[in-house]
Amino acid sequence: MAEKQKAVAKQEKVAISKRDPWALKKWYTVYAPSYLGGVALAEVPAAEAQKLLLRTIEVSLYDITKDISHLPIKLRFQIHRVDGLKAATRFKGLELTRDYVRSLVRKGTSKVSAIVDVKTKDGWVMRISILAVTAHRIGTAQKSAIRKRVAEALSRKASDSDVGQFLKEVLEGSLAAELFVAGKKIAPLRKVEVAKIKVLRYPPEEEQTAVREVAAEEVAAS
């Protein structure tokens, strides 16, 4: 009798899923990492929690701060843990919108780009693109000198900070202000921005957490 009831329940479940795939899905609330305030980022549907793991969520910094000046800053987070209907994330990257970057470079100025790989004191390895815009046109030698100064200041800041402190300074603009001070010693600057961040490698304990969660969900689903 019990076997018959199970078979009937299974048939009903299959019938529902054929009629409406959304019927079996649940809504999960995705949260920012604690070092970025732990605020709710989005609501996402999934039939199984396993299908959420390692999914990337992209939002504007404006969605977190409600500050209109933060609209051009895109943030990427990766889901690495699910607890009930709550999905926790880790930072994956940042990028300024193309329109905003284009608006920074004006006639009669020079653009100086620097790409630097840094490591925080808690083991996060990130590739960071810095954009500096000068007040007037400058030559190749000055561009190289600004690039070197900015790269050195950026590497020092990262190595002295954990990822939470570092990202907080990026998002608040204080890191860009420090890099501005470093670069203007070579030539007058109009603007310095952290244009892009990509996480190249997470600390071992961060990776192990994600691997354990994926493995646990695979076992639960089998």
From Swiss-Prot:
SS bonds (residue pairs): none
Protein name: Small ribosomal subunit protein eS1
GO molecular function: structural constituent of ribosome
Sorted UniProt keywords: Ribonucleoprotein, Ribosomal protein
Cellular compartments per GO CC: ribonucleoprotein complex; ribosome
Family affiliation: Belongs to the eukaryotic ribosomal protein eS1 family.
InterPro entries, sorted: Ribosomal_eS1 (IPR001593), Ribosomal_eS1_arc (IPR030838)
NCBIfam families the UniProt entry points to: PRK04057.1 (NF003142)
GO biological process: translation
